[in-house]
């Protein structure tokens, strides 16, 4: 007999009750005023949800099994496969934090309809963690150079730039539950998952990788519900005018945090780790963030009094350069990574100049020097080209080189009795709003200040099983591999740029 979905959903809602024998206490208190009236836009029932997700899992894992039989892992362009090592180390943490966010919202939001949506999303995020870890395992077992795929959380926690990912994804779970919802569902999932889970898989497929699209597009099929959860939560709290300034502040904060990490990181993977490029990240950002998120999603919220994020114009100014500056910083310090890099060929450089006019004037000489330093017999790494390493921002933990090193927005300010660096006005503003949130951050330089680079690499575990060859390499050539002895000969000392 056919079931009436609305009646079944209403029956499930009837199981909710308000206890009279105990005074409810907020486990995760919120400063937002949350009205009781709200709607779950999908009206999901667990029985239907499980059947739908089971079908998707069967398709995905069945394809991955077939891909192994066709030796697809070794048909992927190696340059592209290497970028999956940091990506698949960082993403499970983001998904795990997203799942914990749903638990916070279930506790904080006294509305059975929204809670039902949060429950389905919590199950989704658990599934996504498993999918991404499995994809890393798939490549670790079947890819020609698995070193680095096995490091996971250990790897990204110790990397200078990848650890900035943790700093951003912690905003999904650290703080006010409604703010976490805005950071995750309204900004992270609605603005940035399309570039990650739709555009990036297209790049993967163009480079011979069909496993990543299978997994990522399966994940993205859940994201529409997560966006709906965010929209329903946002509209609910917007219905109380007292919340508007709090929501606008959260919008301003978390859009900038998402931009400064995701656009730098994902833009680097898309443009610098592709052999067969289907487009540049700058254009993908225009399509998915500006046209789709700002032009469609944000425009619908203007009637509630919500404005586009305060720092959107600065993000637009950054986009032509941000991933190039991030790539230069990452490639300059390639030895402290757990994946291999590749030199940029003349064809690569021509592509960059064509898609980012002026690129060669600002970055071309660096890439020429990088190419000449790829051989360990040259006895130099690109970081030695610079008088010092760039300071790391106290808030976002990214290097203060944006939009470009020659026109960076670095601010070095005395705060709480110590010199602190900020990459932008936005990050300094966030620090001043909640200094206690960021004072405990010990950045990468502070951890390793005064140490020899070789000792740091050994401590981080970025060494291959032979005990001497580095996991990271500045090239993909199986010959002329760098060893820890090559690094020791450099006598390169890690120096905190803000050392007193």
Tell me the role of every PLM-derived stretch:
Residues 55-113:
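Long, hydrophobic/aromatic-enriched structural stretches that serve as scaffold segments
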Residues 6, 34, 39-44, 83-87, ...:
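Alpha-helical scaffold segments that form or flank carboxylate-/histidine-based iron centers
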Residues 1-38, 244-376:
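Extended, helix-rich structural scaffolds rather than catalytic motifs
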Residues 104-116, 138-145, 171-179, 198-218, ...:
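Inter-helical turn/loop segments and adjacent helix faces that build the functional surface
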Residues 343-419, 423, 428, 436-500:
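Intrinsically disordered, low-complexity terminal tails and linkers in eukaryotic proteins, enriched
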Residues 13, 17-65, 126-151, 231-234:
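Conserved alpha-helical segments that form or flank metal/cofactor-binding pockets of metalloenzymes
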């Amino acid at each position: 007999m056919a079931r009436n979905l609305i009646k079944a959903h209403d029956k499930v809602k009837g199981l909710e009750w308000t206890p009279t024998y105990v005074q409810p206490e907020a486990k995760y208190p919120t400063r937002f005023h949350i009205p009781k009236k709200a709607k779950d836009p999908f009206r999901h029932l667990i029985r239907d949800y499980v059947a739908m997700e089971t079908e998707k899992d069967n398709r995905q894992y069945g394809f991955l099994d077939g891909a192994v039989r066709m030796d697809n892992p070794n048909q992927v362009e190696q340059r592209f496969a290497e970028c999956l090592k940091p990506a698949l180390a960082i993403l499970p943490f983001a998904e795990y934090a997203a799942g914990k966010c749903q638990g916070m919202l279930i506790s904080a939001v006294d509305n059975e309809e929204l809670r039902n949506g949060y429950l389905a999303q919590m199950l989704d995020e658990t599934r996504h963690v498993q999918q991404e870890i499995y994809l890393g395992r798939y490549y670790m077992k079947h890819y020609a150079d698995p070193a680095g795929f096995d490091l996971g959380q250990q790897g990204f926690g110790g990397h200078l730039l990848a650890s900035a990912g943790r700093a951003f994804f912690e905003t999904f779970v650290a703080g006010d539950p409604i703010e976490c919802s805005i950071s995750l569902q309204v900004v992270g999932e609605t603005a940035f998952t399309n570039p990650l889970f739709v555009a990036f898989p297209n790049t993967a497929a163009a480079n011979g990788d069909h496993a990543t699209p299978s997994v990522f597009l399966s994940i993205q099929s859940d994201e529409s519900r997560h966006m709906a959860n965010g929209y329903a939560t946002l509209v609910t709290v917007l219905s109380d005018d007292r919340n508007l300034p709090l929501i606008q502040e959260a919008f301003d904060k978390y859009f900038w945090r998402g931009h400064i990490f995701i656009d730098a990181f994902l833009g680097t993977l898309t443009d610098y780790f592709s052999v067969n490029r289907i487009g540049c990240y700058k254009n993908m950002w225009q399509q998915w963030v500006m046209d789709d998120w700002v032009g469609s999603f944000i425009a619908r919220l203007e009637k509630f009094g919500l404005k586009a994020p305060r720092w959107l114009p600065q993000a637009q100014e950054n986009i032509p350069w941000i991933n190039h500056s991030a790539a230069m910083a990452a490639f300059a310090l390639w030895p402290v990574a757990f994946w291999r890099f590749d030199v940029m060929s003349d064809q690569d450089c021509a592509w960059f100049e064509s898609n980012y006019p002026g690129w060669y004037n600002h970055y071309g000489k660096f890439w020429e020097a990088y190419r000449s330093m790829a051989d360990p017999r040259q006895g130099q790494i690109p970081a030695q080209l610079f008088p010092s390493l760039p300071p790391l921002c106290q808030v976002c933990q990214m290097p203060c080189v944006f939009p470009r090193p020659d026109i960076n927005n670095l601010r070095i300010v005395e705060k709480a009795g110590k010199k602190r660096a900020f990459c932008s006005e936005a990050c300094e503003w966030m620090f001043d709003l909640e200094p206690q949130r960021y004072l405990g951050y010990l950045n990468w330089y502070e951890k390793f200040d005064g140490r020899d680079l070789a000792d740091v690499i050994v401590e981080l575990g970025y060494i291959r099983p032979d005990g001497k060859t580095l996991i990271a390499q500045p090239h993909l050539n199986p010959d002329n591999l760098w060893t820890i002895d090559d690094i020791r000969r450099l006598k390169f000392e890690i120096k905190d740029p803000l050392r007193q």
